[in-house]
Amino acid sequence: MELIEKDSGKVMITLHRASDTELFDASESILVWSADSKSVAYGFQDSPPGVRVVERGALVCFWNGSGFDKVFLPENLPVPETKFPKGKGGYEKPYGGGVKPLRWLKSGELELSSEDEVMLRGKTYTGVLQFTISFDAQHHASVKKVGKTKTEVSK
């Protein structure tokens, strides 16, 4: 997965390498551009072959005048606290989760969604929480605002 300059065909940045394709699901990739097109958030999904567990991740790229620089998000991002019916917790089977970029705010902050999906007694519980990342002048990322977890249940 590459960002390519339209006029020249020059590769501006490689987001995923060919060696990553065994785990990488290109159909689930998302690019979220800032209004000035000087920053882009890249969301991706991968899962090991033959395994239903899905992992989502994101990275951010900033324009430096001649290309894009990758900026990785903080390691300990907020994780949703999935809610289970009273007395029904335990014996959960994880199905994955991770973060997905949603939108750039006018302030230059990035809004993301964090998901955690588990199976419990024949039902799928998905905890979702939104949070905001801010960037300093050197593009160091930090968590700024964390919302509340919403739990969805499906069969």
What kind of feature is each model-predicted range?
Residues 1-14:
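Beta-propeller domains
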Residues 1-2, 48-62, 118-133:
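Structural motif
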Residues 12-23, 70-93, 148-155:
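Surface-exposed loop and turn segments in beta-propeller and other repeat-based domains
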Residues 42-48, 112-117:
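Beta-strand C-termini and the immediately following turn/loop, strongest in propeller blades
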Residues 88-102, 117, 137:
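Extracellular glycoprotein-like low-complexity segments
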Residues 25, 29-39, 96, 100-111:
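Blade-terminus and WD-like Trp-Asp/Gly-His loop motifs, strongest in beta-propeller folds
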Residues 64-70, 137-141:
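Short loop/turn segments immediately following beta-strands, especially the blade-tip
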